[in-house]
Amino acid sequence: MLVLFGQPENWHEQDFRAVDDRVRGGSSISHLTEEKDSDGKSRAKFWGTLDTKTLGGAGFCSQATNIKDRTWNLKEFKGIELDIAKSDSYKYTFIIKDCHQDWETSDEKSSLSYEYDFTPIYSKEDQVVSIPFSEFKPTYRGRPVEGAPELDVSKITQFSIMIRSFFNSQSGDYELVLNSIRAIPKNVPFTTHKMSNEKQRLFDDYEKEIAGGSWCICQ
């Protein structure tokens, strides 16, 4: 495994920055803070409050890499592995970009994102979510994009972890603790991950709604 962030090295809070719905007038807030486990190993806690009242049911919080001009070449790898130390039952999104943001302004420059949604098992125990690069879907401001180019894994410019409301399907305080984020070599098998039937139904309804052209304020 190629460690991108975290164990066995330390997490660095300055490598990430908040990109929340406040950029669109919302009230949600996110943090990424480094903490130590019982063995003194570094972990990253993604936490905050997802608000859906201000924007009428919509909302999102995210922490994006904040490393100017950094590019990752992962063409010798086949996916991303999230080593999760602790989680709630919310649905999260892991996002990759292969286009640099506009670092000269304080506003986010909209660009194509490649996203994967996952729902960790509610647990204080370690769990792993493995994501093939082929499963990352192109989106623009939360909407699927048909005919978009494939993710160029040879020039990845940004990673993000996000929680969004999925049209008021979830809100409130959240917390996801990560041991590490790693790239998976081509000769290493993937793990599998499932969500409850009820949560799957809610988010399937969300996918149908955005595919039908409903308004979306998600990043």
Curated annotation (Swiss-Prot):
GO terms for cellular component: cytosol; mitochondrion; nucleus. Its main location: cytoplasm. It comes from the Eukaryota. Disulfide bonds: none annotated. Keywords: Cytoplasm, Nucleus. InterPro entries: Galactose-bd-like_sf, NADH-UbQ_OxRdtase-assoc_prot30, NDUFAF1. The keyword Nucleotide-binding does not apply. One of its GO terms (biological process) is protein-containing complex assembly. It is found in: Cytoplasm; Nucleus. SUPFAM superfamilies: Galactose-binding domain-like. GO terms for molecular function: unfolded protein binding. Belongs to the CIA30 family. This is Uncharacterized protein C9E9.15. The lineage of its organism: Eukaryota, Fungi, Dikarya, Ascomycota, Taphrinomycotina.
